[in-house]
Design a protein with these regions (language model features):
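Extended charged/polar low-complexity repeat regions
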Residues: 1-594
């Protein structure tokens, strides 16, 4: 912490050592501001003074530094490398009113204000600029593409809420709030309303009802932790906690149970998890919450090393595989090296954008960026691709490696409406008020898309004739997909068990005129006691069964009672031997894991 007098003296000493005339830097600040009394004390630097993990190796520089103007305003921020990362400019007349700010390597964003201190303009030299017009209970926002949005508000002070929004395309969305400002309902541009029911005391959402009348319910314990959630399909998610409020068991909607164990009463991080298969995984953590080791269901261990800033510096896996990572003083990843010493290096610009990746063989892939940090040119393997953007940051032109172009157009809500490809073919897209695709055109081929009240796709027409249809049951699960093939109606019907898992697929072919069933075939699916899919039973054929171990690693397959294939895996669960009948396929890996 520094006082105003200390900062003033430091400024004078810097001016003297630099041989310049000292600037006006008062020893005191006005004692009172509209925000209260100002004693002039500011946070100027954060130092690491004690680290139990590295007690004898403390950094010589502060973790972060702050520079202040003579009026006590935050002027600059420096990271732990000493590089400036943020800067701020203030109004000459109004102390504390920011008129510009900049991220290092990015354009300066400037602001203008009205007489009441409200922002009226936001000026961005490399992107969208905005103007703001204020009226009673109404704010109009216009960007530099002349797109306009209007926000209508209700309430005062902390209870002021946006209750209506007029979008740039003329559509309107609305929101309703209760007396204490909690969201109760939202109406989309098509006039459909979603309702929210917050708890009277806690404000937590207890029920959400969608426009089609389907509802989801949420339940909490006295610590406001979610204990149960029931979706529109009736399936329930359940959670249990210990006396310290830590999650100890979660039951998924399909009935799978995951358990969590803790060995430290002061830690929220589990030391072990057990999934529905009974497989147990263990973890160890540092005092700072960093993962140090992970032991999988087979007892195989992966270890992790970190530096004092929490960045991962090494990963050590089974089979002798290790990977090492290096960072620069700003914390940017600059190198990754494997066990064999093969190193991939990374380079950045002053803004922190990744500009180059140098592979172990010396090949270089580079990326160039515009002022706003969007990639405009990428080079890989000697081939270059470039991108052009509009003021809104949307890609409007893509030039491929061979010099051909694809162009894009958007509507006022940033939705893609036209794409002209490398081959000159133009595709157009039309959306409804809520943003769903309802019509697409591909060089004269017109497709229409239709949806139900829950926004689920129900059918698609091509040139005015039905192409595909989708049907759903009352729980919202997909039950049928059908289409016309060579004049015949081909359909797939899906069946589910009580846990929502796929239980059957029934394929049918019907005569187009008489609807006579011409052909059908059914495939059933089965699951083991742990909830893993393990059998596929086609009509009139033996069942195909697969054997797994641990959390689901494939160990073998059989057709009926006849073994088809067996897999042998190493300590990383990679396939090393595949046996099928009298034949074997052996797979080996380099020390680097290739």
């Amino acid at each position: 912490l520094t006082t105003q007098a200390q900062r003033a003296e430091e400024a004078r000493q810097q001016a003297i050592s630099g041989g310049t005339e000292p600037s006006a830097f008062p020893d005191t600040l006005p004692g009172y501001t509209e925000y209260g009394r100002d004693n002039g004390i500011r946070l100027s630097a954060v130092w690491l003074t004690h680290d139990p993990e590295y007690p004898e190796n403390l950094p010589a520089a502060p973790l972060v530094r702050y520079g202040w103007t003579p009026r006590g305003e935050l002027a600059v921020v420096y990271d732990r490398s000493g590089k400036q990362v943020r800067s701020f400019t203030y109004d000459d007349k109004y102390r504390g009113r920011m008129v510009a700010h900049r991220h290092t390597g990015r354009p300066e964003i400037r602001y203008r204000y009205d007489s009441d201190g409200r922002v009226t303009e936001q000026l961005n030299p490399a992107g969208l600029s905005y103007t703001y017009q204020y009226e009673k209970d109404r704010i109009t926002i216009t960007d530099s593409l002349d797109r306009r949005e209007v926000l209508h508000t209700q309430g005062e002070a902390g209870l002021k809420r946006v209750v209506k929004k007029e979008h740039a395309d003329g559509s309107v969305t609305q929101s309703q709030f209760d007396a204490v400002g909690r969201l109760r309902a939202q109406t989309d541009a098509a006039g459909r309303t979603t309702e929210y029911s917050p708890d009277v005391v806690t404000g937590l959402i207890t029920r959400i009802t969608t426009p089609d009348g389907r509802a989801s319910a949420f339940y909490y314990n006295h610590h406001n932790q979610l204990t149960s959630a029931t979706g529109p399909d009736g399936l329930e998610l359940r959670r249990e906690y210990d006396e310290l409020g830590r999650l100890i068991q979660e039951t998924a909607p399909d009935g799978d149970i995951t358990r969590y164990r803790y060995d430290n009463p002061h830690s929220d991080l589990p030391c072990a998890t057990e999934d529905a298969t009974g497989s147990r995984k263990t973890m160890t953590w540092s005092r700072y919450g960093q993962l140090l080791s992970f032991t999988d269901c087979s007892g195989y261990v992966t270890r992790y090393d970190h530096d004092r800033f929490g960045q991962m510096t090494a990963v050590h896996r089974e089979e002798g595989l290790s990977q090492y990572r290096a960072y620069d003083s700003r914390g940017q990843l600059i190198a990754v090296k494997d066990t064999q010493g093969h190193e991939t290096r990374y380079e950045y610009n002053i803004a922190g954008d990744l500009t180059a990746v140098i592979a172990p063989d010396g090949s270089r892939n580079g990326t160039q960026y515009d002022a706003w940090g969007k990639a405009v040119r990428t080079t890989q393997g000697g081939l270059t691709r470039s991108m052009e953007y509009d003021a809104a940051g949307r890609v409007i032109r893509l030039t491929s490696e061979n010099g051909s172009h694809t162009t894009f157009r958007y509507d006022v809500l940033d939705r893609l409406i036209q794409e002209t490809g490398f081959d000159g073919r133009t595709q157009r897209y039309h959306h409804d008020l809520t943003g769903k695709l309802i019509r697409s055109e591909d060089e004269g081929l017109v497709t229409h898309w239709y949806y139900d009240e829950a926004d689920r796709l129900t059918h698609r027409t091509v040139k005015g004739e039905t192409a595909e249809q989708w049907q759903y049951d009352e729980r919202g699960w997909l039950t049928d997909i059908s289409h016309i093939s060579e004049g015949h109606r081909v359909a797939v019907h899906y069946g589910y068990d009580s846990k929502g898992r796929l239980a059957s697929e029934h394929l049918t072919v019907h005569h187009p005129q008489t609807n006579e069933l011409l052909w059908q075939h059914e495939t059933r699916h089965a699951y083991n006691a742990q909830g893993l899919a393990n059998r596929c039973i086609p009509d009139s054929l033996p069942a195909v069964e697969w054997l797994t171990y641990g959390s689901g690693w494939l160990a073998g397959m059989k057709l009926g009672d006849t073994p088809l294939v067996d897999f042998t895996r190493d300590r990383l669960h990679r396939e090393t031997l595949r046996s099928f009948g009298r034949y074997e396929l052996t797979t080996a890996y380099t020390p680097a894991g290739q």
